[in-house]
UniProtKB/Swiss-Prot annotation:
Keyword terms, alphabetized: Lignin biosynthesis, Metal-binding, Methyltransferase, S-adenosyl-L-methionine, Transferase
Protein name according to UniProt: Caffeoyl-CoA O-methyltransferase
Positions annotated to bind S-adenosyl-L-methionine: 58, 80, 82-83, 88, 106, 135, 160
Pathway the protein takes part in: Aromatic compound metabolism; phenylpropanoid biosynthesis
PANTHER family listed in its UniProt record: CAFFEOYL-COA O-METHYLTRANSFERASE 2 (PTHR10509:SF74), O-METHYLTRANSFERASE-RELATED (PTHR10509)
Organism name: Solanum tuberosum
Annotated residues for binding of substrate: 16, 158, 189
Single GO BP term: methylation
Gene that specifies this protein: CCOAOMT
EC nos: 2.1.1.104
Pfam families noted in UniProt: Methyltransf_3 (PF01596)
Length: 242
């Protein structure tokens, strides 16, 4: 028979926290996250919770982490690949100075427009340049132009996991030396350590190998320093050093 601790662990892949205890995660949210969550972010989080694909959103604790991180590095020029309804985008916009900019790319404008009224009401829409469509062609054009090399303070990637390595090959040229790239979902619901016969959802099993490949590549990349954190579904921060 399982102990109380075992009963409290997340049994179903898809939970946004990697903590072993639901109660402990709820404690963090209720003690440190929700009481300090800006009203606009709370509103967008509650709107997104009604979306059938709400698990795609950035968790509230990760949003808080990103917001503080951006302030600590004094970010001004940023990029986000994978927007969904815009919760992490809103966290970023709130952290940037009034003349800060975010190039935001997603293949689905409809989801972005769910959160856009909240962003507009918060007076932050002027910071966002939203582009609908695949990000790779945009990145290739930016690299070809030449003027964008080393121009970004921070880049956040929360998109198609099978293209993470393709993004990295390009983003390393676009982020400045000393700047950060954040890759989301790098622990992928904990599946990175799941045994081969573990009962995983089809999409989790499919993308797991891409996440494993990314993690291995980042750890071996001499151009960056890395820090992998168990926040949300796992986020790996890469600081460009050369």
């Amino acid at each position: 028979m399982a102990s109380n601790g075992e009963n409290g662990r997340h049994q179903e892949v898809g939970h946004k926290s990697l903590l072993q205890s639901d109660a402990l995660y709820q404690y963090i949210l209720e003690t440190s996250v929700y009481p300090r969550e800006p009203e606009a972010m709370k509103e967008l989080r509650e709107i997104t919770a009604k979306h059938p694909w709400n698990l795609m959103t950035t968790s509230a604790d990760e949003g808080q982490f990103l917001n503080m991180l951006l302030k600590l590095i004094n970010a001004k020029n940023t990029m986000e690949i994978g927007v969904f309804t815009g919760y992490s985008l809103l966290a970023t916009a709130m952290a940037l100075p009034d003349d800060g900019k975010i190039l935001a790319m997603d293949i689905n404008r409809e989801n972005y427009e769910i959160g856009l009224p909240v962003i507009e009401k918060a007076g932050l829409a002027h910071k966002i340049d939203f582009r609908e469509g695949p990000a790779l062609p945009v990145l290739d054009q930016m690299i070809e132009d030449g003027k964008y090399h080393g121009s970004y303070d921070f880049i956040f990637v929360d998109a198609d996991k099978d293209n993470y390595l393709n993004y990295h090959k390009r983003l390393i040229d676009l982020v400045k030396v000393g700047g950060l790239i954040g890759y989301d979902n790098t622990l992928w619901n904990g599946s990175v350590v799941a045994p081969p016969d573990a009962p995983l959802r089809k999409y989790v099993r499919y993308y797991r190998d891409f996440v494993l490949e990314l993690n291995k590549a980042l750890a071996a990349d001499p151009r960056i320093e890395i820090c992998q954190l168990p926040v949300g579904d796992g986020i790996t921060l890469c600081r460009r050093i050369s």
